[in-house]
Amino acid sequence: MAITKEDVLEFISNLSVLELSELVKEFEEKFGVSAAPVMVAGAAGGAAVEAAEEKTEFNIVLVDAGDKKINVIKVVRALTGLGLKEAKDAVEGTPSVLKEGVSKDEAEAAKKELEEAGAKVELK
């Protein structure tokens, strides 16, 4: 009686992880192949790449405080909860990361507030 594919699959499914690892190594040696995953070519369409790179978390980076540092310090304190000295140091030590890992909506709202106060902000 011949061994079928189903018999082979049933045998393999009953192996332990260690036994399966040894079996894979023997396949690699016997047939001169590698069990490394195959690299898939990237998508050609720009829209598909943009959708794949859509970020969900952003860092709010203060690039420049502008001329109205006092207003920017007030907004930084309100957004971050920092004390006066810490907020002043963050504003004067640009570029500085004000918040990390925030949602897109929160990041855009903070950027708008800071820009209205006279600062230059980047979302990364």
Curated annotation (Swiss-Prot):
It comes from the Bacteria. InterPro entries: Ribosomal_bL12, Ribosomal_bL12_C, Ribosomal_bL12_C/ClpS-like, Ribosomal_bL12_oligo, Ribosomal_bL12_oligo_N_sf. SUPFAM superfamilies: ClpS-like, Ribosomal protein L7/12, oligomerisation (N-terminal) domain. GO terms for cellular component: cytosolic large ribosomal subunit. GO terms for molecular function: mRNA binding; structural constituent of ribosome. Gene3D superfamilies: 3.30.1390.10, Single helix bin (1.20.5.710). Keywords: Ribonucleoprotein, Ribosomal protein. GO terms for biological process: translation. It holds the Pfam family Ribosomal_L12_N. HAMAP family: Ribosomal_bL12 (MF_00368). Forms part of the ribosomal stalk which helps the ribosome interact with GTP-bound translation factors. Is thus essential for accurate translation. Belongs to the bacterial ribosomal protein bL12 family. Homodimer. Part of the ribosomal stalk of the 50S ribosomal subunit. Forms a multimeric L10(L12)X complex, where L10 forms an elongated spine to which 2 to 4 L12 dimers bind in a sequential fashion. Binds GTP-bound translation factors. This is Large ribosomal subunit protein bL12.
